[in-house]
């Protein structure tokens, strides 16, 4: 059995706060994790596969400790959504500005990134990689 199969909402919710703290998580993050794990609202609603990205982000940010950036990263890395552009991510912003120094405002960056639709998640990966001199496996 893979460890991923043993990390469940129920298992996390049953952990004492100290167990999460001992993993190196901050008290605040540990409390957020326990709060989400013990919340009755499903993290992913029924039919989430059919929801558009913005609707899913609106659902996720209702959980305490989940902001737009966290929700976008979840869509990119966990749900493998292909067209997420995270302008709340400093690396993405720096990467876009490296490609087009004139793109300073959010609307200007969105205009640059419009050419990458419907693969803006992959564009984020390339933008992050362009800033990192050491190869990284995602």
What does each model-identified segment do?
Residues 4-64:
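Alpha-helical ds-nucleic-acid-binding substructure associated with the helix-hairpin-helix region
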Residues 30-31, 35, 53, 68-138:
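C-terminal accessory module of base-excision DNA glycosylases/AP lyases that mediates lesion recognition
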